Swiss-Prot record:
One of its GO terms (molecular function) is ATP hydrolysis activity. PANTHER family: MACROLIDE EXPORT ATP-BINDING_PERMEASE PROTEIN MACB (PTHR30572:SF14), MEMBRANE COMPONENT OF TRANSPORTER-RELATED (PTHR30572). Belongs to the ABC transporter superfamily. Macrolide exporter (TC 3.A.1.122) family. This is Macrolide export ATP-binding/permease protein MacB 2. Keywords: Antibiotic resistance, ATP-binding, Cell inner membrane, Cell membrane, Membrane, Nucleotide-binding, Translocase, Transmembrane, Transmembrane helix, Transport. It comes from Yersinia pseudotuberculosis serotype I (strain IP32953). SMART domains: AAA. The gene is macB2.
Length: 678
């Protein structure tokens, strides 16, 4: 059946049926519908509840597809189109007016009206100007920034009408537009719809009220899914007096727009790159805005969701910083022993019971080693514990007999005075270099120790220098040390001709392992056997570095588990969010959002939650590091840009990975089911 032709055929249904499966039953809601709508008509589809009128409207608006038969929109068949093409049809050619308005509560009236234009890629300033123009012309100029909760029912429905017109609204589909309004507001809405019809819009009103249907020029009655009447209205209603809406949008015919619709993606692709990036940026900006609004609406839930991410990121960053700090501390301790050094001891290894009886390490060995080209410096070493005295002060300390190159080998700095020389060693001079701890104990009142004579046991020695304090993890920093020429210690104190150890510093350009083999070979030849062992500081360094890295990795893996738990929490909350915002998803799809737009919005929300959690986690870790430094002066957590950047990358990945399933679920929603969700 057809009504009076007012323009070209716009919408046509042939033998259209729609069935739904409920349990094991198949329910036919529409049965062999044949209907043609022309451009510029004002049609009312009227019927009781369950007659199929809303299902018919959903098919007309490309929200649903027929189970059988065919539906044409200006020559195109929607049921054969993909979801993006259907979204484009809804976005560019249809405007929906719902009984319950379906406005987004977190957006203002203007922002609600702008939504279809966002998905159409319209410039921000242009769509804002258009939204203001539309709202002003329907009497809401003073309420542009009002939220839906601040508007009356009639005002909310006007906002819904403005939203339907945002992209042109060639076909206005109004589902019970006055059902939730009082009589006065309902008449205002009907007058607006009639005025839009006079401007050339095709208006389809779905209602159960025949008095509402009487305002249309053509009435189609449905009963039990079939058209039982299709009659024109021969007498025209009075021209509406409530509002006058000049053509607020330059509307080409739908036939013209549809004919070029297939070329739209190509045209977009041909736009300048800057323009395409601007459109994409605009969509991302709006998605970020909606994500922030959604997070702000559920502050406590958002905070609890982020808690797992905060703890996980803080744990990972802190563990890495602790590992880095401990590694640097250990390396500093090893460097305190001297860089690129070899320590030569009698015996086979530490703890060798026979080492005390081996007296083959001699000062001549040190002299021969010093002549090797790959060796930078050498110092023999002997030591003993004695009582140190000056005046009436006496303390226990260690006397170290060393060579003149000892301070160079060990990397010590002379803070006061000077170190002894080769002449001091050769002449068995009774000269001493003390450390700062010894100076503070024997000369507590700031008296200069230089030139003073102290007793090392029973041996008097003149202080010629003070060595600066040096941190070392191998022995207490509070030890009292005195250094004298090793010849003086051996002859005047110990009465021995053998050494406790020899320390060798290798040239920086020489591989320490090769130098170690050279030393072993040389001394073995001199001794006739290998009755000594060599401690390579680089080997210790590498072992400690490997151990530290392994422990850091192990603890990091434990921290990563908390990140995964946090990610699962994000996914859980995002699923809840998708369920709570089902109607919003339906509205966005109805006004033209593609599946990718919906997915993008929820992915951005998940990533934003994780990034914010990651930022707070990094801040928490830095705070822990600050507190740590306040209570520990000898050790600090070392943060690196790489670890912080990695933390943010991990946060983003968690958002993408654990937000993907909820976002996909949202994108795959049926718009009809979403709109019907209470």
């Amino acid at each position: 059946m057809t009504g009076p032709q007012q323009g070209k055929i716009l919408l046509r249904l042939e033998n259209v049926s729609r069935e739904f499966i409920t349990g094991e039953q198949t329910v036919r809601v529409l049965n062999n519908i044949n209907l043609t709508l022309h451009s510029g008509e004002m049609v009312a589809i009227v019927g009781t509840s369950g007659s199929g009128k809303s299902t018919l409207m959903n098919i007309l608006g490309c929200l649903d597809k027929p189970s059988a038969g065919e539906y044409w929109v200006a020559g195109r068949i929607p049921q054969y189109l993909g979801s993006d093409a259907l979204a484009e049809l809804r976005r560019e050619h249809f405007g929906f007016i719902f009984q319950r308005y379906h406005l987004l509560n977190d957006l203002s009236a203007r922002e609600n009206v702008e939504i279809p234009a966002i998905y159409a890629g319209i410039d921000r300033e242009e769509r804002r100007k258009r939204a203001v123009n539309l709202l002003s012309r329907i009497g809401l100029a003073e309420r542009l920034d009002y939220r839906p909760s601040q508007l009356s029912g009639g005002q909310q429905q006007r906002v819904s009408i403005a939203r339907a017109l945002m992209n042109g609204g060639d076909v206005i589909l109004a589902d019970e537009p006055t059902g939730a309004l009082d009589t006065h507001s309902g008449n205002e809405v009907l007058n607006i719809l009639k005025d839009l019809h006079q401007q050339g819009h095709t208006v389809v009103i779905v209602t159960h009220d025949m008095s509402i249907a009487e305002h249309a020029q053509r009435i189609i009655e449905l009963k039990d899914g079939e058209i039982i009447a299709d009659r024109p209205r021969d007498h025209a209603q009075e021209k509406p007096k409530m509002v006058d809406i000049p053509s607020v949008i330059d509307i080409p015919s739908m036939d013209e727009k549809i004919s070029t619709g297939a070329q739209q993606e190509t045209e977009i692709a041909r736009k300048p790159l800057l323009t395409r990036w601007k459109v994409q940026y605009d969509r991302l900006h709006e998605a970020f805005k909606m994500a922030i609004l959604a997070m702000a609406a559920q502050r406590l839930r958002t905070a609890l969701t982020m808690l797992g991410i905060i703890i996980g990121i803080a744990s990972v960053v802190s563990v890495v910083a602790l590992g880095k700090g401990s590694q640097q501390q250990v390396l500093a301790n090893i460097n305190a022993m001297g860089t690129s050094t070899l320590e030569i001891f009698p015996g086979k290894d530490f703890g060798d019971m026979r080492s005390a009886a081996i007296h083959t390490l001699r000062d001549t060995d040190a002299d021969v080693l010093a002549q090797q080209g790959y060796i930078h410096s050498v110092t023999p070493t002997v030591s003993t514990s004695v009582t140190l005295r000056y005046g009436n002060k006496s303390v226990s300390g260690t006397v170290n007999g060393v060579g003149e190159q000892y301070f160079l080998v060990r990397g010590y700095t002379i803070a006061q005075g000077m170190a002894f020389t080769r002449t001091s060693v050769n002449d068995l001079m009774q000269e001493a270099v003390i450390d700062e701890n010894t100076r503070d104990k024997l000369f507590p009142n700031g008296e200069t120790p230089l030139g003073k004579v102290i007793l090392l046991g029973s041996l008097p020695c003149r202080v010629i220098g003070v060595a600066a304090k040096k941190q070392s993890g191998f022995g207490s920093d509070e030890n009292l040390n005195v250094w004298i020429p090793y010849t003086t210690a051996m002859k005047r104190m110990l009465g021995q001709s053998y050494l406790k150890s020899i320390t060798v510093r290798v040239n920086d350009d020489i591989d320490l392992a090769n130098a170690e083999q050279g030393v072993i070979k040389l001394l073995s030849q001199r001794h006739g056997t290998q009755d000594f062992f060599v401690m390579n500081t680089d080997s210790i360094r590498q072992t400690i570095q490997a151990t530290t890295s392994t422990m850091t990795l192990l603890v990091s893996m434990i921290a990563v588990i908390s990140l995964i738990v946090g990610g699962i929490g994000v996914m859980n909350i995002m699923l809840v969010s998708v369920t709570e915002r089902t109607k919003e998803i339906g509205v966005r799809m109805a006004v033209g959002a593609r599946a990718s737009d919906i997915m993008q919005q929820f992915l951005i929300e998940a990533v934003l939650v994780c990034l914010l959690g990651g930022s707070l986690g990094v801040a928490l870790s830095l705070g822990i590091g600050l507190l740590f430094s306040l209570f520990s002066s000898n050790f600090s957590m070392v943060y690196s840009a790489a670890s912080i950047i990695t933390a943010f990358v991990c946060s983003s990945l968690i958002g993408v990975i654990f937000g993907f399933f909820p976002a996909k679920r949202a994108a795959e929603m049926d718009p009809i089911r979403a709109l019907e969700r209470e």
